[in-house]
């Protein structure tokens, strides 16, 4: 598939970990003495160290320049096939003097794992990648970006091989727009060529990005779902309906009236509710069917995807976070894993956990769209209720993801770093944000 400029394409064909193929289940490259013997480096130098995590062996990496690329090699890795999926795990500590929180970890080729790691403490790093082959020898890449003459320590390193016969979403492709605003938009392409969109983004640059992407596949959207009425989620579909030749076969949304929002909150987006309703009614040639989702509704979207409605939309209680809390959460079921789209859901997410059916549906999802752009959304209890989070989807540009008010990392008053730490401690391996230019993910 062609990767369009300004479009973040996440082809979630990551293979499920079905158990290691190595004898004993895991290929530990952190032998009692010999971690350094399993590593080679370009762009830096490696020395042995006893300063490892919990007393284990470590290697000290000194950066020659900004980027150092490690290659992990051993007999077990060499027994695998090129492009086999593996999980890499290690502990990382670095000297942050003058460069605190700036170290970045990549899988390879600019494919970012994460950044913003706290300095001078042991951070847990875990991600899926693939086996590379060069000159008949297999290896796994880990790329670190930092600063010349700075040091980092790597300890407790292990590589686990996993079967690659089961794509994460069963062949369904999930595409996240690389938003230039703080907006949210996801496109789903199924093996039977159904085009599904969730939200869409903010008027302006996001409209052009979405339009280019949709025209790559079709001039028609089969199913378009809107979580709530806020303009950073909905003005892109509004622009396409009003000004472009995109046809929407089925549009799913349920907004309160503008007057209701005005009466129950101080939300400044309240005029958009009625404007959008009028726009849809006045363009029946572009919007063929309008469906108002309700609690427990299920929609079969072709042969491969089912969308479930986990809660009713707006309510009649005054609330300072009314716009976000009036949204709908959708669960997308595929032949593989299930995806939870939370939109901007706030503290009302906990209310839906009290409903037996909703809780069961929520806790069984494994790919999670982080609520309200990954900060000040649903509670820790909401995320902790989800049993096995494999992937976090952040509809967040860099300044939100890094809590940056323009003065650098962690200088704003957002909740994003707390949520990132929560996911990191749970060992989530794959974190995707709309503010990072990603390549195709395995």
Q: Would you name each region that the model predicts?
A:
Residues 18-32:
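Sec-dependent signal peptide cleavage junction
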Residues 48-67:
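Short carbohydrate-recognition loop motifs
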Residues 126-158:
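Extracellular beta-strand ligand-recognition surfaces/modules
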Residues 109-137:
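Extracellular carbohydrate recognition and processing domains
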Residues 39, 59, 72-98, 125-129, ...:
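Extra-cytoplasmic beta-strand recognition segments
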Residues 62-83, 100, 106-115:
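Secreted extracellular polysaccharide-interacting domains
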Residues 178-185, 191-217, 225-243, 310-400:
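Active-site-proximal loop/helix segments of hydrolase catalytic cores
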Residues 250-252, 256-324, 391, 396-442:
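Binuclear metal-ion centers of metallo-dependent hydrolases, dominated by the metallo-beta-lactamase
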């Amino acid at each position: 598939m062609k990767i369009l400029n300004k479009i973040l394409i996440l082809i979630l064909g990551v293979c499920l970990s079905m158990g290691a193929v190595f004898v004993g289940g895991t290929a530990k490259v952190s032998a009692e003495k010999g971690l350094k013997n399993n590593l080679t480096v370009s762009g830096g130098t490696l020395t042995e160290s006893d300063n490892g995590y919990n007393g284990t062996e470590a290697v000290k990496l000194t950066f020659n320049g900004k980027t150092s690329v490690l290659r992990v090699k051993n007999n077990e890795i060499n027994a695998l096939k090129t492009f086999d999926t593996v999980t890499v795990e290690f502990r990382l500590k670095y000297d942050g003097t003058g460069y605190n929180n700036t170290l970045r970890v990549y899988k390879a080729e600019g494919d970012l794992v994460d950044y913003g790691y706290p300095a001078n403490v042991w951070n847990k790093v875990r991600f899926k990648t693939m086996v590379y082959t060069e000159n008949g020898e297999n290896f796994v890449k880990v790329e670190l970006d930092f600063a010349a003459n700075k040091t980092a320590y790597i300890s407790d390193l292990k590589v686990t091989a996993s079967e690659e016969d089961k794509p994460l979403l069963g062949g369904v492709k999930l595409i996240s727009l690389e938003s230039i605003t703080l907006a949210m938009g996801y496109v789903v392409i199924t093996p039977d060529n159904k085009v599904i969109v969730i939200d869409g983004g903010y008027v302006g640059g996001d409209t052009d990005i979405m339009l280019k992407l949709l025209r790559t596949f079709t001039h028609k959207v089969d199913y378009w779902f809107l979580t709530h009425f806020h303009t950073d989620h909905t003005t892109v579909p509004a622009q396409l309906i009003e000004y472009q030749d995109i046809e929407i076969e089925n549009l799913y949304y349920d907004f309160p009236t503008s007057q209701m929002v005005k009466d129950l909150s101080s939300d400044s987006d309240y005029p958009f509710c009625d404007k959008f309703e009028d726009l849809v009614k006045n363009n029946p040639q572009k919007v063929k069917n309008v469906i108002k989702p309700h609690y427990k509704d299920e929609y079969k979207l072709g042969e491969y995807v089912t969308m479930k409605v986990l809660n009713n939309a707006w309510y009649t209680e005054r609330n300072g976070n009314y716009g976000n809390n009036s949204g709908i959460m959708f669960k997308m079921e595929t032949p593989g894993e299930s995806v939870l789209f939370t939109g901007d859901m706030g503290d009302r997410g906990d209310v839906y956990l009290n409903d037996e059916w909703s809780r069961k549906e929520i806790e069984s999802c494994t790919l999670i769209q982080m609520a309200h752009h990954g900060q000040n959304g649903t509670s820790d209890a909401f995320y902790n209720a989800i049993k096995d989070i494999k992937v976090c989807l952040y509809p967040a540009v860099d300044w939100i993801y890094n809590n940056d008010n323009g003065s650098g990392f962690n200088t704003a008053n957002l909740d994003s770093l707390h949520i990132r730490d929560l996911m990191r401690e749970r060992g989530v391996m794959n974190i995707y944000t709309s503010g990072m230019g990603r390549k195709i993910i395995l």
